[in-house]
């Protein structure tokens, strides 16, 4: 699982606005903002959550750690 803080951090690493991520992930901006405002692991519909996670991973984000202990993100530059 991915935390709301990881989603925000990943977006910051990519220098994406919330609107950009919502468009790439094909979710509404309201949905994305709700997930980012959550404390810890957002309560999300699985389909939307997977879209957000996959959009970030496709852009080079790697989610590291686990949600309960030292969650983080890192950016892999594309070759």
Mark where each language-model region is.
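Residues in the recognition helix of alpha-helical DNA-binding motifs
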Residues: 10, 24, 35
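Residue-level "edge-of-site" marker
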Residues: 24, 45, 69
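DNA major-groove recognition helix of helix-turn-helix/homeodomain DNA-binding modules
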Residues: 26, 46-63
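Helix-turn-helix/homeodomain-like alpha-helical modules used for DNA recognition
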Residues: 61-79
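A short, Lys/Arg-rich alpha-helix, primarily the initiator
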Residues: 1-12, 50
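Recognition helix of helix-turn-helix/homeodomain-like DNA-binding domains
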Residues: 27-44
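Short basic helix-loop element that most often maps to the first helix and adjoining turn
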Residues: 7-20, 77
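Residue-level recognition of specific faces of alpha-helices
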Residues: 6, 31-34, 48, 72
């Amino acid at each position: 699982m991915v935390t709301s803080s990881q989603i925000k951090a990943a977006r910051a690493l990519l220098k994406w606005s919330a609107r950009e991520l919502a468009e790439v992930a094909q979710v509404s901006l309201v949905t994305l903002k709700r997930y980012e405002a959550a404390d810890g692991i957002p309560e999300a519909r699985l389909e939307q959550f997977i879209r957000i996670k996959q959009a970030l991973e496709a852009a080079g984000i790697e989610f590291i750690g686990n949600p309960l202990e030292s969650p983080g993100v890192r950016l892999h530059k594309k070759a």
